[in-house]
């Protein structure tokens, strides 16, 4: 499991296990409070639907949804019904081991996409034009990820 820790603006230490609804909520809070992300992602418009394939300690498929818009995260949902979000801008699919490797910095997200360890459905042109936003999103996610057990 991934143990997540970070300090909020008020100095409160929070922790959650990846993957969990609590982790996803902490990611939302961090995305909405990170000034660097807000600046870099100010022109991004696109929601993300993640499919995490079971592997290792994850025994069943997992999904989560993020609505990212102009440097903010407007909504997150853990284990959403895919029918509620029939046409997200991007669908990202990866095995549990590959997604945790990206979250811990062991696997570069661009390398993961190019080698199909992280599969992306949606406008690759848009994503490639917005590589700084993609990389900073990953940076924020990595900052809330402190260790893998």
Residue positions per predicted region:
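Feature captures hydrophobic
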Residues: 4-149
């Amino acid at each position: 499991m991934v143990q997540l820790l970070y300090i909020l603006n008020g100095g409160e230490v929070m922790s959650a296990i990846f993957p969990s609804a609590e982790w996803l909520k902490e990611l939302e809070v961090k995305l909405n409070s990170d000034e660097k992300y807000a600046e870099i992602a100010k022109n991004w418009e696109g929601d993300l639907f993640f499919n995490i394939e079971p592997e290792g300690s994850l025994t069943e498929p997992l999904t989560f949804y993020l609505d990212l818009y102009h440097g903010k995260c407007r909504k997150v949902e853990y284990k959403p019904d895919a029918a509620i979000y029939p046409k997200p801008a991007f669908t990202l699919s990866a095995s549990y081991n590959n997604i945790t490797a990206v979250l811990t910095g062991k696997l570069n997200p661009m390398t993961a996409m190019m080698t199909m360890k992280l599969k992306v459905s949606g406008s690759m042109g848009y994503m490639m034009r917005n590589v700084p936003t993609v990389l900073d999103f990953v940076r924020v996610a990595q900052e809330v990820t402190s260790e893998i057990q």
